[in-house]
Amino acid sequence: MSSIAAWGDGRRTRIGVLGGSFNPVHDGHLQLARRALRHLRLDQVWLMISPGYPLKPVQGMAPFDVRLASVAARFDGRRLVATDIERRLGTRYTVDTLGLLRLRFPHAAFVWLMGADGLADLARWRDWRRIVSLVPFAVLPRPTYNPGALRGEAAVALARWRRPARQAPILADCAPCAWAFLPAPQIGISATELRASALRQRSRHPTHKHTTHQE
């Protein structure tokens, strides 16, 4: 895991920010991060583990340090970087986190990354219009979510700022509220499904100890 200074620095790099609970981390996260690096021509993707995810229940959430270590073990720490910076910033909501990142890394070009499921839920996020006014963002497809996400409240409200996928390489250079829906194979795996699968295995074999990845 690479330590990113919470007080910031003067780096002039193109950085994708992929936040989430990572409970657990899975191949879909890795695929999304790699595709973002390639399609958006980023220098790094920060996998930002959330101390507490407001839209997800606390029950079943692995401890933060376990999730952080699990993510760090899956990514190279150079271009794909697991980070606890949100915990060190002391923020709870994305709008506050992105605001501080812009303030403390004033020369970095940030792109916020999400799956289509995130776009579908975006209008439920605190100050979501403020979020998209802070940095451009990129959306990657997720099975069953794509049509609803693109017809949802946030996507409709932001339709005039949507860039064609061919402009994805310059998205980091665009002013907010620019966004793009990236072309990519759809990522079907989800943390929810992995947790449910692990629970089913434990229920079938109650006396057998299972080791599962935690994010």
From Swiss-Prot:
Task of the protein: Catalyzes the reversible adenylation of nicotinate mononucleotide (NaMN) to nicotinic acid adenine dinucleotide (NaAD).
Enzyme Commission number, as recorded: 2.7.7.18
NCBIfam families per the UniProt record, alphabetical: PRK00071.2-2
Domain of life: Bacteria
TM regions (residue ranges): none
Keywords assigned by UniProt, alphabetized: ATP-binding, NAD, Nucleotide-binding, Nucleotidyltransferase, Pyridine nucleotide biosynthesis, Transferase
Name of the gene: nadD
Broad EC category: transferase
Record organism: Gluconacetobacter diazotrophicus (strain ATCC 49037 / DSM 5601 / CCUG 37298 / CIP 103539 / LMG 7603 / PAl5)
Keyword Zinc recorded: no
Pfam families named among the record's database cross-references: CTP_transf_like
A single GO molecular function term of this UniProt record: ATP binding
Protein name: Probable nicotinate-nucleotide adenylyltransferase
Family assignment from sequence similarity: Belongs to the NadD family.
UniProt key word Mitochondrion: no
Record field: catalytic activity: nicotinate beta-D-ribonucleotide + ATP + H(+) = deamido-NAD(+) + diphosphate
Listed pathway(s): Cofactor biosynthesis; NAD(+) biosynthesis; deamido-NAD(+) from nicotinate D-ribonucleotide: step 1/1
UniProt record, GO biological process: NAD biosynthetic process
